[in-house]
UniProtKB/Swiss-Prot annotation:
Protein known as: Large ribosomal subunit protein bL9
Region annotated Disordered, chain positions: 155-179
UniProt entry keywords in alphabetical sequence: Ribonucleoprotein, Ribosomal protein, RNA-binding, rRNA-binding
Gene: rplI
UniProt function note: Binds to the 23S rRNA.
A molecular function GO annotation: structural constituent of ribosome
């Protein structure tokens, strides 16, 4: 089933895109939520006319996204999280926390356009991708640090080496009796 998106849908497409989705997803979610309409011939003609009229507006939106991306260049974030003694985070760092840290730096972005892959569950350096426009993305480096004072590096535990016992008179007698 082809639908025309009426708004941006994460991991599917942007407003006014014509996308192919499964029938159930279109009929039971996108259309009832008002996020899409069925892509009939008349709807496609209306969309084409609207796109022609809004071509200069789309260019303006892209320009604003590029300006915002330029203002975000060079920003790096530090996020504090509660951790175990080995550096594993209790919970995980989410796009909400990234959006809050960006707001503290003076950059307002919607949390829905921030993508974190892979899930951030340990102390370390990561990168978040902010999708400002379908053609404009920004990578924001961030570091996750512990709120705790010390972090012990996890080391593989060494198995104790068994110490060979010297044969005593009792063990020698037991071996002889066993034979």
């Amino acid at each position: 089933m082809q639908v025309i998106l009426k708004e941006d849908v994460v991991n599917l497409g942007y407003k006014d895109d014509i996308v192919t989705v499964k029938d159930g997803y279109g009929r039971n979610f996108l259309i009832p939520q008002g996020k899409a309409v069925i892509a009939s011939e008349s709807a496609k003609k209306v969309l084409a006319e609207n796109l022609r009229q809004r071509a200069h507006k789309i260019a303006q939106i892209k320009k604003e996204a590029e300006e915002k991306a330029a203002s975000m260049q060079g920003i790096s974030l530090t996020i504090k999280a509660k951790t175990s003694s080995t550096g594993t985070i209790f919970g995980s760092v989410t796009n909400i926390q990234i959006a809050e840290e960006l707001a503290k730096k003076g950059v307002e972005v919607d949390r829905k356009i921030i993508v974190l892959k892979p899930a951030v569950k340990e102390v370390g350096n990561y990168t978040a991708v902010v999708r400002l426009h379908k053609e404009v993305t920004v990578e924001i480096p961030f570091e996750v640090v512990s709120e705790n004072e010390t972090i012990i590096e996890a080391k593989p535990e060494e198995a104790p080496v068994p110490v060979a016992e010297e044969p005593t008179a009792e063990t020698e007698q037991a071996e002889v009796a066993a034979e």
